[in-house]
Regions:
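Ferredoxin-reductase
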Residues: 1-120, 177-178, 203-207
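Short, conserved phosphate/pyrophosphate- and ester-handling motifs at nucleotide-, phospho-/glycolipid
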Residues: 28, 150, 244
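A short, basic/flexible loop-to-alpha-helix module at the beginning of a structural domain
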Residues: 114, 126-139
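Phosphate- and divalent-cation-binding pockets in alpha/beta enzyme and binding domains
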Residues: 134, 153, 250-251
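Conserved S-adenosyl-L-methionine
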Residues: 139-140, 163-170
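Conserved beta-strand elements of the Class I
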Residues: 141-145, 240
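Histidine-anchored nucleotide/phosphate-binding helix
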Residues: 151-163
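Reductase modules of NAD(P)H-dependent flavoproteins
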Residues: 169-272
């Protein structure tokens, strides 16, 4: 249906589901998406004007992607309740670009390249949804902690809870590198404005000089520690984590120091 750029390396991919087929979806689930054999020249990918400078400086349009056989990867679903009702599945696709200076020896991600280049009308082989990463049916306060495309399942969970009219307190800590890497900002600002039981803290670890960022800075686990140290009972909250492995490890160590037991922590590392 659409494949919209949200950050220099992140697109929101919206797929229309086959009519008449059951879609047993719960927020936090994922699907398996398959890239067929393909050849791709990144010069052929249309880049939004807002991100052309980032692409030019990084030299990403010089990359080429290819696969000689089908390859499948898991991607978390970023749906809001209305998306599923309209027969759509939403994903946050992060293009796995090689480290700077190593483009000639390390190819970009096989499946992420294919999905990043999709255009409206293209068909995608998909299966699912799957997964056990869901909000627990309790009355405890929920703390969501994400980074990168770890946004996807957490966004779905928050929208699911809002749609149910929950009165549970919810906090969302989201880490990005710079302002260009931050997305769905207006959406979460609006939720926070309309729902007093929801608050969110976007934090930038390396804001660009031109960002004029006045919000939280530093790594997300440090922001979580600073906020939850002031909480009367951080061990009584539930924690939902999704993001890069290094972020997950740092957050788990932070939560352990706060006295949070492992049974109160739920995490997923699909699609990161």
């Amino acid at each position: 249906v659409s494949n919209t750029m949200k950050a220099p390396l992140i697109r929101e991919l919206v797929l229309k589901l086959p009519e008449g087929q059951p879609f047993d979806y719960r927020a936090g689930g994922f699907m398996q998406l398959t890239a067929p054999p393909y050849r791709l020249d990144f010069h052929d990918i249309e880049i939004d004007e807002a991100f052309t400078d980032s692409w030019r400086i990084a030299g990403w349009q010089e990359m080429r992607g290819s696969s000689d056989s089908p390859v499948t990867r898991a991607y978390s679903i970023a749906n809001r309740p209305q998306d599923a009702a309209e027969g759509r599945a939403v994903f946050n696709i992060r293009l796995a670009a090689p480290p700077p200076g190593r483009e000639q020896e390390i190819p970009p991600g096989i499946v992420s390249s294919y999905l990043f280049a999709l255009k409206p009308g293209d068909e995608v082989q998909a299966s699912g949804p799957f997964g056990e990463f869901h909000v627990q049916p309790t009355d405890r306060e929920m703390v969501f902690i994400g980074g990168g495309v770890g946004m996807a399942p957490l966004r779905a969970m928050i929208h699911e809870q809002i749609g149910k009219g929950t009165t549970r307190k919810m906090r969302y800590f989201y880490g990005a590198r710079s302002l260009a890497d931050l997305f769905y900002v207006e959406e979460f600002d609006a939720i926070a404005a309309e729902h007093p039981n929801f608050s969110w803290t976007p934090a930038l670890s390396d804001p660009a000089p031109g960002d004029r960022w006045t919000g939280a800075t530093g790594f997300i686990h440090d922001n979580v520690r600073a906020a939850m140290q002031k909480h009367p009972a951080p061990e009584d909250c539930e924690y939902y984590l999704c993001g890069p492995p290094v972020m997950i490890s740092a957050v788990l160590a932070t939560l352990a120091r706060l006295g949070v037991e492992p049974h109160s922590i739920f995490n997923d590392d699909f699609g990161v």
